[in-house]
């Protein structure tokens, strides 16, 4: 039995012995290169293990792989057999009884192709010796030695030397380790970050990962959505304990959603440090919930454990790593204090949480799926393609295209699924499996019900039937939301034409929809848009001869002059008498045929949402569209935008609405919203232009 206080001295003795006996460390001690390329200086590259070679070899994966397998490896205190516990590739060992040799023909050919190095080029020789010195200096760098100690301690931790029980990291746990470890490298070793990234690749089994992808670990924030009981808090405790004990001058923060969780983590970190390391170096301050680990001759490392209920406890602190446990349940009042660390140059926030589908407010992290940087990491047992199959088969517990890997401490089968869903429908998918597809489809607080959308799609009105046409009003309401661009990836001109029931103005029928883009940016944009409106009205009037007048609103928020021009052209060319919504000029008594959209938009959206959910909005069986693709049903085109409606809360407690998607604008939806608003409110005054 050995005291923990003696561990450091024994570790140093073992490391020295390994370095003396190592057969690979001598490679960096070579004074003469194996290859000496004597070309121009810009064309050569000094490699510390090979010599001076052509610079094109910098991009040679074979050389990189050869040096990684046969070159010197960082000497870890634990044996290399323990490294595969968290994904490392084992070192290549050649059996003693096997004598490796080259075939004579191959040897002679290589000797002709590779003449003895020419050591007369003193400049190239100096470059080689400089590269060797630089490589040695990195292996002796204090930060490198600390990082090596962290990897060594992690291997020992997983092999059971601390907890007396071997463990193996899950994929997401390894990711949390990598995000923490590589970020600390990037802030503690700025000048040699890429070199150290490369050195530690083999320890984590990342040989095939490019340096560009490794830079993902330098992100200022990372988010992990993990199912319940998968070891989220366990790995955070291990990471914090090992960082404190092996790395100097590191400040860590831990924020939990409940006080008892923070207290449990605080106690577990103390227990790990005092039992596995020198307890005399551990200082605990229970009043401030801080733990300090003193490093001889270096700056101490600390961790503070706080809760979101004391939102000011972390203000004024400096953290290099801030772990936010169960982040989906953190009080929103505490988020500004947490997100403030994003401004700190050498700080990283790691959000770790389970998935919760009970409330939109506690599932906000999934919104980061659209972030420009790949911040979101989700563990799920079902993919998007098989989501519907999963719902239809009660016996399925995972996606058929996945190779199911369930941690040993998790029970997941059809009986568990059935029992869990009896308590709360859908709980198995979200809480236990990490399924976030329901979040992406807006099922948390669905704005428009699925059955209402299905009715809008399937139950269309036969407006060509004389009996139905006799019940419809004689007025056609048209709303024009013009856009003066020919970029089909941006917003286009949205046009919607509706009418209503003669007896019930709240019952609205959609007769026409247009999504129009300018062919080119010329001076006749107003003419093109107006022509599109006139063509739509002409088609509708041809099918519905009972219509007697057209009431139009041309939005003028983008360009008032163009809106007036559009209204004038429509008034002159329309086959029916036209009346327009007018806006009074503030500086004079003049009224212009345009509509300025203000705060009525939110009310109009709410009115349309109510209409869809109550089936008071319908579409005609002959809904007209001259611009939406012939292969695409205009009503389905509209429904795709209705499904995307989402409310956005404002500071004053009200909401604004949008239907914009990544690959589709909401121009047609906005036009329909406002056309429906004009037809149902009956409060706007329409006047003729001439």
UniProtKB/Swiss-Prot annotation:
Entry's Gene Ontology BP terms:
chromosome organization
Motif annotated as Walker B motif, chain positions? 321-326
Q: Where is this protein primarily located? A: host cell
A Pfam family cross-referenced in the UniProt record is DNA_pack_C
According to the UniProt record, one GO cellular component term is: host cell nucleus
The subunit field of the Swiss-Prot or TrEMBL record says: Interacts with the terminase subunits TRM1 and TRM2. Interacts with portal protein.
Name of the protein: Tripartite terminase subunit 3
Task: Read off the lineage from the record.
Answer: Viruses, Duplodnaviria, Heunggongvirae, Peploviricota, Herviviricetes
